[in-house]
Amino acid sequence: MTTAAQVSGLDVAPTRHARLVAWVREIAELTQPDRVEWCDGSEAEFDRLTSLLIEQGTLVRLNDEKRPNSFYAASDPGDVARVEDRTYICSEQAEDAGPTNNWLDPAEMRATLRGLFAGCMRGRTMYVVPFCMGPLGSRISALGVEITDSPYVVISMRTMTRMGTPALEQLGTDGFFVPAVHSLGAPLEPGQADVPWPCNTTKYITHFPETREIWSYGSGYGGNALLGKKCYALRIASVMARDEGWLAEHMLILKLTSPAGKVHYIAAAFPSACGKTNLAMLIPTLPGWQAETVGDDIAWMRFGEDGRLYAVNPEAGFFGVAPGTGEQTNPNAVRTLWGNAIYTNVARTDNGDVWWEGLTKQPPAHLIDWKGRDWTPESSEPAAHPNARFTVPAGQCPTIAPEWEDPRGVPISAILFGGRRATAVPLVTEAPDWRRGVFFGSIVASETTAAQAGAIGKLRRDPFAMLPFCGYNMADYFAHWLEVGQKADQTKLPRVYYVNWFRKSPEGRFLWPGFGDNSRVLAWIVGRLEGTAAGVETPLGVLPTKDALPVDGIDIAEEDLETLLTVDVEVWKQEAQLIPEHYQTFGERLPAALWTEHEALVERLNSAD
């Protein structure tokens, strides 16, 4: 067995943080790497690691004239996405993980992990990656250290976080950090050849909420391996937020400037495939309005001394789904991707560029698909994997707001919730108070099947868009949101809105144009915040009057607008009947206030007859 004394680089730690140094030594003794490297985040380090990855066959450098300083990687076909069935919240008590998370006894899990991690880095380098989630020096930010045996993870963390020496200096000699251990689970014996994408068929993505630890084994894919992202910024941070009185949320942050020059910041939570990145990079079709991006995926929010809720984007990059991203849907994302990007599981063109479905209207005549095969438009499979990804610095976005790295954060005026609903849910509804807003967040769903006329399709609930990402019992999470509202100055809380861009006609036609025209809904929301936009009370909440929604310049039929801005009482009676089944999932821990909200909705619907 390799001892710590035999591991090259272990005794040259560039820090006097005793707990960190002891932890690195402990993991090195367990995993037995050939050497240890402390990452500084420098360009020289990035160049060295990308050269190493090219040599190993993991990366291909793209055409520098087309995509400067950009790289392509193809994963193992069995390692292409987050593995929710292998993701665990190992709280001390099972009930603290709740019914929506996988739980195993933490002592049992630790024993399993110790067995898997024993010797798992043999023949490899162990990289120590200090990183900061959020702007360096912000009171809203927090630090972490990831140990990994994947240089692909190191270069990706350099894009996605503030990584290296600045984060290590911020940590000082005794600062708090979240320890995150990652291994591909692919040790190399002496003389054994490596593969381009090492991984293991056994996978565990494990969180220990009480000790704020993350252990990930067997996967090299982003969400499972870049442990600052979902693992820390949502699962562990949501527990920290519960304990410390703040919010860690799966939300974009958007800066909106009205024609009068007034600025509002909006946070929005949508499940996957509901247009979050598109809204974060919105190009308004309304004349005089400007939209800028603060964040596209995660928001950390704390109350400021003035009583307002301030948000930072804890990430430094975008880790986006490539397919469906194009000039028609998200031109700002396309312009962000001019260079300094890592593409995973997209297709490659004959001239050393990348392509994916949705990038252009017509595909190239020939490609190399994500599995390395020749591809033509006649091929039966997509050229890019549906979950193909790009990793790119956020600062390259042409609409990035100057405030995106402000350590003070930005004050949030409104919070939006929404799913992909073909039926029932109006275009936009204002909650009269915070509690109704929490109720809206708790019932977010997307329709997974088409509905018959006058009925509702099968719903997949994703409350607050946090179902895969909440690090503790979701009923307690709802209670935390309610408590945050109760403790705050009610006059300074953000207003809450329930939006739905995806309403369809009975024939399956979208009623709302969406994309840049969603700025029209945001304009009404800003009007509500400023007291200038008219609304009408409904059993659900306040909807725009037809005259209050600015629809000049878009082709929308009068009856479609009527449908979008109406609460159909009979359909909502059906909708209300579906909520108890969802709530009963959470048992007795569900806050009574949400049952009260549900009962009040039923009463308002019955009174509306």
UniProtKB/Swiss-Prot annotation:
Catalytic site: 274
Biochemical pathway: Carbohydrate biosynthesis; gluconeogenesis
One Pfam family here: PEPCK_N
Organism the protein comes from: Frankia casuarinae (strain DSM 45818 / CECT 9043 / HFP020203 / CcI3)
EC class: lyase
Protein's name in the database: Phosphoenolpyruvate carboxykinase [GTP]
EC identifiers of the protein: 4.1.1.32
Family: Belongs to the phosphoenolpyruvate carboxykinase [GTP] family.
Subcellular location: Cytoplasm
Catalytic activity, as annotated: oxaloacetate + GTP = phosphoenolpyruvate + GDP + CO2
Positions contributing to substrate binding: 82, 221-223, 272, 387-389
Residues given in the record as GTP binding sites: 273-278, 389, 420, 515-518
